[in-house]
UniProtKB/Swiss-Prot annotation:
It comes from Pseudomonas fluorescens (strain ATCC BAA-477 / NRRL B-23932 / Pf-5). Its EC number is 2.4.1.182. It comes from the Bacteria. Gene3D superfamilies: Glycogen Phosphorylase B. Pathway: Bacterial outer membrane biogenesis; LPS lipid A biosynthesis. It catalyses: a lipid X + a UDP-2-N,3-O-bis[(3R)-3-hydroxyacyl]-alpha-D-glucosamine = a lipid A disaccharide + UDP + H(+). This is Lipid-A-disaccharide synthase. The lineage of its organism: Bacteria, Pseudomonadati, Pseudomonadota, Gammaproteobacteria, Pseudomonadales. The gene is lpxB. GO terms for cellular component: membrane.
Length: 374
């Protein structure tokens, strides 16, 4: 069996999870394989030789990216040169489309096979990117069925592989066991999840804590749990919590345990909303961006929804409160009835979970190996 050399680039924590799962499946299906590129700790643990820390790519928002643009462009140029010299059997860009799509285009021009894993939101905005994808990408692997339909219509080779989180998370999570593990009492419990990036927590952290205080005034028995994505986010949240009298437990990571344990979630729009959906926890989605970023996006977005649960349901399944509509009072009022209710949401969540549960990492690995004839 000849040794395969596979290059992968992931740009943030969610991509690191998907990349590690794909690498594990590739090693089972083709044990003689080595991995190069850029990834986080999970991908490195599976054997990736990472050229630089993945955190250097984790930037969100049009305005925010501008401040780091020179560094990002320089890193991408160097990465393209390195990968063309290394000549991997296949390159897999995992999400991070503004960084990886250009790499795919250049590598494909150099006759290197290219795969993009996780569709960018081309169906929602900047639809002309599909032309670049068609030119630069031998195969698109999508997590969601509505994305695969979009690419089929546009003539892009595509495979819907499902989502590895839907495989990993049980159809019915044990709330009592999760609470026992975390040492949490019975009674109403709300998870607060203001995001994993510093900018997100800066815009949403205090707002979510204000909403928690309003909710506590409406429902004196309610308690809160807040997972911190990193030590840096914990410091940031501890500063925001100072001088607030809230029955709140901070966790280091453990977002899945927090979701399993809670009754409802106040959550930033992003990948975590999919996790909340898979745990069948009723949610209210909120988001704030830099005002200029929001103004630009509002004029570009084609989709009526921003959150994954609504995009997957193709209807308004969960409330979305954005920008100026995301006030502490509005969030508390919208969340309160979901603590004991939310059955319509959870029914929809169960249906979506079953659709996405397809053994994603193995499906993706088979598709990659099929592309390169292995």
């Amino acid at each position: 069996m000849s040794t395969l050399r596979i290059a992968l680039v992931a740009g943030e924590a969610s991509g690191d999870i998907l990349g590690a799962g794909l690498m594990r499946a590739l090693k089972v299906q083709h044990p003689a394989v080595e991995f190069i590129g850029v990834g986080g700790p999970l991908m490195e643990a599976e054997g990736l030789v990472s050229y630089f820390p993945m955190e250097r790519l984790a930037v969100m928002g049009l305005v925010e990216v501008l401040g780091r643009l020179r560094e990002l462009l320089a890193r991408r140029k160097k990465l393209i040169q390195t990968l063309i010299a290394e000549k991997p059997d296949v390159f897999i860009g995992i999400d991070a489309p503004d960084f990886t799509l250009n790499i795919e285009l250049k590598l494909r021009q150099a006759r290197i096979k290219t795969v993009h894993y996780v569709s960018p939101s081309v169906w929602a905005w900047r639809q002309k990117r599909v032309l670049k994808i068609r030119e630069g990408c031998d195969l698109m692997l999508t997590l969601f069925p509505f994305e695969a339909r979009f690419y089929e219509e546009k003539g892009v080779p595509v495979k819907f592989v499902g989502h590895s989180l839907a495989d990993a998370i049980p159809l019915e999570a044990d709330r009592a066991a999760a609470r026992a593990e975390l040492g949490l009492p019975e009674g109403p419990l709300v998870a607060l999840m203001p995001g994993s990036r510093g900018g997100e927590v800066g815009r949403l952290g205090a707002l979510f804590l204000d909403a928690a205080q309003r909710l506590r005034a409406m429902r004196p028995g309610v308690r809160f749990i807040m997972p911190c994505a990193s030590p840096e986010r914990r410091v940031q949240l501890e500063q925001l919590l100072a001088n607030r009298d809230l029955p709140l437990t901070l966790l280091d990571g453990q977002s899945h345990k927090a979701l399993a344990a809670c009754d409802a979630v106040l959550i930033a729009s992003g990948t975590a909303t999919l996790e909340a959906l898979l745990y069948k926890r009723p949610m209210v989605v909120a988001y704030r961006l830099a005002p200029l970023t929001f103004w630009i996006l509002k004029r570009m977005v084609k989709s009526p929804y921003i959150s994954l649960p609504n995009l997957l349901a193709q209807r308004l399944l969960v409330p979305e409160l954005l920008q100026d509509d995301a006030t502490a009072d509005a969030l508390a009022q919208t969340l309160s009835p979901l603590i004991e209710g939310g059955e319509e949401q959870t029914r929809g969540f169960d249906e979506i979970h079953r659709t996405l549960r397809r053994d994603a990492s193995n499906q993706a690995a088979q598709a990659v190996l099929g592309l390169i004839g292995k």
